[in-house]
Amino acid sequence: MRPRITVVAPSRIKPLEIPEFTTIWQFKDIDISHFLDLARGQCRADKVVEALSNGVKSPTVYVLDCDGYYPGLNFVFGLAVPVLKTAVVFTARLVGPRFEERLVKEITHEAGHLYGLAHCANPSCVMYFSNSLLDTDRKSPYFCPKCRENLARIL
């Protein structure tokens, strides 16, 4: 049995198959203006997750149409806080002809963190840390055997 996640996405995004998870899609256009750091033109990821986690009871990944950052990093594609059961994926850097593929990978990656998986050293594994879009494009949308085994142990 696959683990379950809820994905809350802007209404412009169509539901996508997230191969490693049973996925419930909800559509909500979230006002990002109060998350935006005007000096950077980016949303601070940890503050976004904290704000959106209110009332979350099961693993939930929010998809936001903005660019995200975390203190000490120029940008992040997403951030998960397992204790809050909440993650966020930012779409700004995923644009292009591979947008849907990239979005699936980033949702899967952050959902993996929500279930307790760490970053993986295997560059083909979806849990590999992406420093760039090239890293995201190279990796698959699937867990490697080691991460799949770790997830099975966690579940």
Curated annotation (Swiss-Prot):
GO molecular function, one term: metallopeptidase activity
SUPFAM superfamilies: Metalloproteases ('zincins'), catalytic domain
Cofactor: Zn(2+)
CC cofactor note: Binds 2 Zn(2+) ions per subunit. One is catalytic, whereas the other seems to have a structural role.
Keyword line: Hydrolase, Metal-binding, Metalloprotease, Protease, Zinc
InterPro entries: MetalloPept_cat_dom_sf (IPR024079), Pept_M54_archaemetzincn (IPR012962), Pept_M54_archaemetzncn_arc/bac (IPR012091)
PANTHER family: ARCHAEMETZINCIN (PTHR15910), ARCHAEMETZINCIN-2 (PTHR15910:SF1)
A Pfam family that the UniProt record links to this protein: Peptidase_M54
GO biological process: proteolysis
Role: Probable zinc metalloprotease whose natural substrate is unknown.
Gene: amzA
Family recorded in the similarity comment: Belongs to the peptidase M54 family.
Keyword match Glycosyltransferase: no
Recorded superkingdom: Archaea
Assembly: Monomer.
EC number: 3.4.-.-
Protein name: Archaemetzincin
Lineage: Archaea, Thermoproteota, Thermoprotei, Thermoproteales, Thermoproteaceae
Residues binding Zn(2+) 1: H109, H113, H119
UniProt binding sites for Zn(2+) 2: C120, C125, C144, C147
Location of the active site: E110 (proton acceptor)
